[in-house]
Design a protein with these regions (language model features):
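Sequence context surrounding c-type heme c attachment/ligation sites in exported
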Residues: 1-82, 344, 356
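Primarily short, surface-exposed interaction patches in extracytoplasmic proteins
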Residues: 8-10, 38-39, 79-325, 344, ...
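Active-site Gly/Thr loop motif
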Residues: 329, 336-347
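Short, surface-exposed polybasic-aromatic patches that bind anionic ligands, especially phosphate groups
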Residues: 457
């Protein structure tokens, strides 16, 4: 591979991502020619590119350079282990008795603590005497350089703050300065979209002339100013939104509201949208008490169908995780960009090739097949059935009531309970005691119970619209 080609592609991706994430601008359109719709020239693009063009980059297999980034708890453990090693070494030097073994054990303990702490990949600037000259790329081709440019932000948005360094730290200051209203607006809009299902500006990724106008411009501006005045606190922003009377409305829709506000752009009711891909899986595991609570660590490989994931060059294989790693949060799922996890992809998760600002939510039959048949959901149903079995009584309803409440966090209404009982009795006929069908379902679910009918009912409850939808 051409090392410089990949380095340039990575730098351009950082430029595009920075401007789209923080400014809501499709600046990547200006890498080959001046932007067709927004007032951003090709010179603006490469002047901004110059800020990111001075970092140590190479097409290496490792993540260097990295920064040692322990959590507060990890830092205390690491410091305590380090102090123990220093103390034992000092005592060893001052004592005629041998203490080599104790020092060795303590150093091993220190190294084990170090291994649990993340090393975060960072960008480190080149030394002053090694700085690169940035040139405009004709038609975006790095092999066809044109005029040299100096590092600068797009003219449309004003210069760097007075006294700010002409590097990436200066860009950060520029993004957050009060004279730049876009950063706060774009961030507030993104949080609003996560809570309401759609942003005040629907096109989260494009605040330019081709993006859609805000449905409530004054509200967007007020939230942006309030966000900045509260020192960019996301916690405060989320609290102010979810405690509002607008958010706390009922999600019920009437014919009048449907006619006047079909997409809820006027906020006539509370949002009701399907959970994200990762949350759909994590919720099922959490309801079944299977979700592993561990924070941080290496990526894991939860179950997926055989043959989906193959690596031609490295020989790496998808090894279905076992034990606690099997049920880690979906955030930790190993991501191969050419072959994302199929269950997550079916629910609109991104492939990881580029930064995805907004997921377009789809509704397909394939999604129901995932929640009914995918291994994680079947095993979650098995664990739920096992929990429900603890409430078993003389009547099927004795187990079905708590099972329903475990999943939907409310007691079932009488017609709902009647349908559940009828479903359970039907499933008993589908999976009779001692049958091969019963054995296969119980085995697939990993459940301790042999009640295949209860597993099937739990599976149906996990697949309900009410379960998969944010109320």
């Amino acid at each position: 591979t051409d090392n410089e080609e990949f380095r340039v592609a990575a730098v351009k991706d950082r430029v595009d991502t920075t401007m789209q994430v923080w400014m809501g601008l499709t600046m990547g359109c200006a890498k080959c020619h001046s932007h067709k719709y927004d007032p951003i020239s090709q010179s603006d693009y490469y002047s901004f590119y110059a800020f990111f063009n001075q970092t140590e980059d190479a097409d290496r297999g490792d993540d260097s350079p990295t920064l040692f980034t322990p959590t507060e708890v990890q830092a205390r453990s690491f410091d305590a282990a380090g102090r123990t090693v220093k103390l034992l070494e000092a005592r060893h030097k001052a004592s005629p008795e041998s203490g080599d073994e104790r020092v060795k054990v303590s150093k091993t303990r220190l190294e084990n603590v170090r291994k649990t702490i993340a090393n975060t990949p960072i960008m480190r600037d080149l030394a002053a005497n090694k700085q690169r000259t940035t040139k405009i790329h004709n038609r975006g081709n790095f092999l066809d350089p044109d005029d040299a440019v100096e590092a600068a932000v797009p003219e449309l948005f004003g210069p760097l703050p007075e006294g700010a360094p002409r590097n990436r730290a200066g860009v950060a200051d520029w993004l957050l300065q009060p004279q730049n209203p876009l950063t706060a607006r774009v961030t507030v809009n993104r949080i609003w979209a996560r809570l309401f299902g759609i942003g005040i500006v629907e096109t989260e990724e494009d605040f330019g002339t081709q993006g859609l106008p805000p449905s409530h411009p004054e509200l967007l501006d007020w939230l942006a100013v309030d966000f900045r005045e509260h020192e960019w606190s996301l916690k405060q922003l989320i609290r102010s939104i979810v405690l509002s009377s607008t958010y706390q409305q009922a999600a019920l829709i009437t014919p009048e509201k449907q006619a006047a506000d079909p997409r809820n752009r006027l906020l006539s009711r509370s949002p009701r949208v399907r959970l994200s891909a990762e949350t759909v899986r994590d919720q099922a595991l959490s309801l079944a008490n299977l979700l592993t609570q561990k924070v941080g660590g290496a990526s894991v490989m939860p179950p997926q169908p055989a043959g989906v994931w193959k690596s031609t060059y490295s020989g790496l294989k998808w090894e279905n995780a076992t034990g606690p790693d099997r049920y880690r949060r979906s955030l930790y799922t190993y991501l191969k960009r050419t072959s994302p996890h199929p269950a997550l992809l079916t629910f609109d998760a991104g492939s990881g090739e580029v930064c995805q600002i907004r997921r377009i939510r789809t509704n397909t039959p394939l999604q129901a097949l995932v929640t009914l048949n995918e291994v994680s959901f079947v095993e979650a149903a098995g664990a739920l059935a096992n929990r429900a079995g603890k409430f078993r009584g003389s009547d099927h309803a004795d187990s079905l009531k708590p099972l329903f409440q475990m999943v939907l966090i409310r007691p079932p209404k009488f017609p709902e309970l009647a349908r559940l009982v009828a479903l359970y009795e039907t499933m008993q006929q589908e999976f009779p005691e001692g049958s091969e069908a019963q054995r296969m379902l119980v085995q697939a679910s990993g459940s301790k119970t042999s009640d295949a009918a209860m597993i099937a009912v739990a599976n149906v409850l996990l697949n309900l619209d009410e379960t998969l939808t944010k109320p």
